[in-house]
């Protein structure tokens, strides 16, 4: 019976330490020191008036024209390859296949910056 009591005394302080590791949120913390367990509960942070005033000031100074998105990037590549007539490659007879030269390095097809690896 004494061995069970000793084992329980050894396990209980470790259980208090494990609580902080098993929690899914950082809203509370548990620590064990000398057999006592202390649970600390923190309130979630809310937006302060100072932070809200700063964000409002920041939005007021941002020029809107600079952040507008273009429909296409100015350096974006134009359509480099014309489609095959009737979607058929005249050299191989492939229907609906990729247009242009065969893959050049590492066996990759690359069109407009997108790579397909075969």
UniProtKB/Swiss-Prot annotation:
User: Residue ranges of region Disordered?
Assistant: 65-118
Q: Does the keyword Transit peptide apply?
A: yes
Establish whether keyword Nucleotidyltransferase is in the entry: no
Which GO cellular component term is one of those annotated?
mitochondrion
Keywords, A to Z, come to: Chaperone, Mitochondrion, Transit peptide
| Principal cellular location given in the protein's record | mitochondrion
Looking up Pfam families in the UniProt record yields: DUF1674
Locate the coiled-coil region(s) and give their ranges: none
Look up the transit peptide and give its residue range. 1-30
UniProt record, GO biological process: cellular respiration; cellular response to reactive oxygen species; mitochondrial respiratory chain complex II assembly; positive regulation of succinate dehydrogenase activity
Locations listed in the record: Mitochondrion matrix
Which molecular-function annotations from GO does this UniProt entry contain? enzyme activator activity
| InterPro entries attached to this UniProt entry | SDHF4
Biased composition, class Basic and acidic residues, residue ranges: 66-81, 105-118
Task performed by this protein = Plays an essential role in the assembly of succinate dehydrogenase (SDH), an enzyme complex (also referred to as respiratory complex II) that is a component of both the tricarboxylic acid (TCA) cycle and the mitochondrial electron transport chain, and which couples the oxidation of succinate to fumarate with the reduction of ubiquinone (coenzyme Q) to ubiquinol. Binds to the flavoprotein subunit SdhA in its FAD-bound form, blocking the generation of excess reactive oxygen species (ROS) and facilitating its assembly with the iron-sulfur protein subunit SdhB into the SDH catalytic dimer.
Assembly and binders: Interacts with SdhA in its FAD-bound form.
Q: Please state which protein family the record places this protein in.
A: Belongs to the SDHAF4 family.
Record protein name field: Succinate dehydrogenase assembly factor 4, mitochondrial
Q: Which organism is it from?
A: Drosophila melanogaster
Gene symbol? Sirup
């Amino acid at each position: 019976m004494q061995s069970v009591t000793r084992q329980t005394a050894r396990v209980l302080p470790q259980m208090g330490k494990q609580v902080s590791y098993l929690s899914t949120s950082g809203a509370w913390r548990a620590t064990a020191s000398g057999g006592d367990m202390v649970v600390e509960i923190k309130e979630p942070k809310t937006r302060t008036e100072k932070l809200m005033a700063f964000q409002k000031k920041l939005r007021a100074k941002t020029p809107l024209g600079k952040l507008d998105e273009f429909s296409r990037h100015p350096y974006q590549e134009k359509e480099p390859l014309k489609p095959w007539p009737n979607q058929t490659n005249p050299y191989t007879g492939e229907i609906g296949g990729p247009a242009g030269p065969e893959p050049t390095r590492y066996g990759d097809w690359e069109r407009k910056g997108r790579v397909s690896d075969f």
